[in-house]
Design a protein with these regions (language model features):
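Membrane-interface helix-loop-helix junctions at transmembrane boundaries of multi-pass membrane enzymes
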Residues: 2-5, 131-137, 194-195, 236-250, ...
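Membrane-embedded helix bundles of polyisoprenyl
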Residues: 12-21, 72, 99-119, 138-191, ...
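Hydrophobic/aromatic-rich transmembrane helices and adjacent perimembrane loops
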Residues: 102, 170, 219, 373-401
Length: 539
């Protein structure tokens, strides 16, 4: 049996990635970040539904002032499951969210490390495992992979997602992207070689996991996979004729992923029409107001505000690509034709990177207008997440090809160490968060109640609502100084209401996905359960 050997370069990368997460170790939480409160109270309501027996949650009971809302019909659930693991282990909601970010960040760094090693030559791993007669020496391929991982971890928009936006699903999506490209690239490059069923299954599962992490991944991440498939098939076609087996494998991988994703997509398509979804693509979520000006890609500006200037001149949040990433992209542009390894991959990344920058710019508005489903993405600048992957992978490949020889010694490899350190230092000033104390009400239904009071325009209505409202019979319970909640079991008072006849409410209860109680009626009458009506409720 072969002895398991740890990769010291991977361990080095994971250790060097930890400073990017330093604010997560501090007391407090980013409640004032764009999605900071959502990341916490979504997990709180997800946990309440899990504990109430809904293993695939759909309902978030605290929304709409206690009437509830099918939040998890439109919010992809996988990120919440990651946090839920830590909640069930006994950790607090906010600590669980922080640990989910930790897992996602390290998984993403590991993924792009593995992809870079793969693109620069898997034989390097075999050579490393076998050892060398000359004794230990630095490995240029894995050091380039470490550089890619650091570029990805410290990419400015990754820090934006963590500390400016505090967006759980968006940040965890970054963990999937390199693994997704790696899985599909192996599926296409190795084709029908032995082991193809395993590679097919892995590719399908990784794509399904990506889609189940964020609702907009189908419209943003999936097209990236399509570009990779087209790139590899075109390569094979030029050499050996049309690659039928690879084409079938790619289609099968996508189809299997969609079959898994159907558990989320089908209810969304069937029942989403009962929700007033215009609120999610209008007002502050209108993509027309969130394109990125070219200068913003290069601007060193950093702030914790919003993308609130339609022309981009005074946006309160940063959209920079990062100094090191830009320099390495320019270097790659001028050296790609002379690259010794991964030349085709560098060319692919350059084309995709330029395409992403175009799609985020105002020049692409006709494209967004012509494809209405793209409005679901809401913010064109969200594609900076993909740019981070593209330019980080490109940076690692470019760095290796800048080395003086194919089998570099210690001296040229030192340049990789320096560039990896520069990737960290260039973004180090941005590793900061606006932290607030974690008060008890921040982790129960009062957090949702308070948010809806501050943002009544964010109320979720169904098609059965004829008149907008901002308070319910349950609002007073949330505002009460005596409010107490354990895993979503409040507010119960006011949950049952006798609307006709005479009687009294003996007891009532509420859970994450259920509500009810006992009523003693003196005459025939009608009892209303104060919960939003929606298809699927069982009485």
């Amino acid at each position: 049996m072969r002895k398991l050997r740890l990769d010291p370069y991977l361990l080095l990368l994971l250790v060097l990635a930890l400073p990017a997460l330093a604010p997560l170790a501090a007391p407090g939480y980013m409640f004032d970040a764009h999605d900071g409160r959502h990341s916490v109270f979504y997990v709180q309501m997800f946990d309440a539904s899990i504990r109430d027996g809904a293993l695939w949650p759909r309902w978030a009971m605290h929304h709409t002032q206690g009437l509830g809302y099918p939040t998890f019909l439109i919010q992809a659930p996988l990120g919440f499951y990651v946090a839920e693991v830590f909640v069930l282990l006994g950790l607090s909601i906010t600590m669980s969210v922080k640990l989910a970010w930790l897992v996602g960040t390290l998984a993403g760094a590991w993924g792009i490390y593995r992809l870079t090693v793969y693109w620069l030559g898997d034989h390097a791993i075999a050579e490393w495992r076998a050892g060398g007669a000359d004794g230990p020496r630095l490995d240029g391929v894995r050091l380039a992979a470490v550089a890619s991982g650091l570029l990805y971890t410290y990419f400015p928009y990754h820090l934006v997602d963590l500390y400016v936006r505090a967006a759980l699903a968006d940040t965890l999506l970054l963990a999937w992207v390199p693994w997704l490209i790696y899985a599909f690239d192996r599926l296409l490059v190795l084709g029908s070689a032995p082991g193809w069923p395993r590679r097919l299954g892995v590719a399908a599962l990784v794509l399904a996991g990506t889609l189940l992490t964020h609702a907009f991944a189908l419209l943003s991440i999936a097209p990236l996979v399509v570009t990779l498939v087209v790139f590899r098939l075109a390569q094979r076609w030029r050499r050996n004729g049309f690659p039928w087996s690879e084409t079938l494998l790619a289609c099968a991988g996508g189809a299997l992923a969609l079959l898994i994703y159907a558990i989320f997509l089908v209810p969304l398509l069937v029942e989403g029409r009962y929700l007033n979804q215009q609120v999610y693509v209008s007002g502050g979520y209108d993509y027309r107001d969130h394109f990125v000006q070219v200068g913003q890609f290069l601007s060193p500006y950093w702030g914790f505000g919003y993308s609130d200037d339609p022309v981009g001149a005074n946006d309160g949040m940063p959209f920079q690509l990062g100094l090191v990433q830009v320099v390495l992209a320019i270097v790659a542009l001028f050296t790609v034709r002379r690259a010794e390894r991964a030349r085709a991959e560098m060319g692919y990344l350059l084309v995709v990177g330029v395409g992403l920058l175009f799609v985020m710019s105002p020049l692409a508005r006709p494209l967004w207008d012509a494809v209405p489903p793209l409005a679901v993405i809401q913010f064109p600048w969200r594609l900076l997440a993909l740019s981070g992957f593209v330019f980080s992978a490109l940076g690692g490949l470019a760095l290796w090809n800048l080395l003086p020889s194919a089998l570099p010694g210690v001296r040229p490899e030192g340049g990789l160490v320096v560039m990896g350190a520069l990737a960290m230092l260039a973004s180090y000033p941005y590793i900061q968060a606006n932290l607030s104390p974690i008060e008890p009400w921040r982790e129960d239904g009062r957090a949702v109640y308070q948010f809806e009071r501050e943002h009544p325009d964010m109320f979720g209505y169904t098609t059965w609502v004829t008149q907008p409202f901002t308070t319910t019979v349950l609002s007073a319970a949330y505002a009460s100084p005596d409010y107490v909640e354990h895993h979503g079991d409040a507010p119960a008072d006011g949950r049952l209401e006798i609307t006709a006849g005479k009687g009294s409410v003996v007891e009532s209860y509420v859970g994450g996905s259920s509500a009810g109680g006992v009523v003693a009626m003196q005459t025939p009458g009608t009892v209303r359960i104060n919960v939003y009506y929606f298809p699927g409720w069982m009485v």
